[in-house]
């Protein structure tokens, strides 16, 4: 059993609202670089994130909302249509493939849960996760899906 694993995939950086938006996943690469530079992280410690399924995301989010997020990320939703769902706002603007990018962050958290629950690691960190402001049917505070809530429901299952 490993003492700790760090869940990371370069595609996690696709969770990006815009170049000027205050929420930026640069912290992922900066943290990885820092940990590597001080000898606290090796390639063997990195576990790839996986994409959460719609069924897993639906543990904490309405299926209708998941479909709205997919439509928004494929350019099939106007900001006015997305506004009741918290999508297309200043906090949570639409961006290409937003469902896929968000599902990868949720899947990264579930990957961390699996590593600990299956006894593969004592500790696991998905620094791309922790997006806890999302509601069951509404984005909020830069968070499309609430990976923390999904993980809790996932563990309970």
What are these regions (language model features)?
Residues 1-157:
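HDAC/HDAC-like amidohydrolase catalytic core signature
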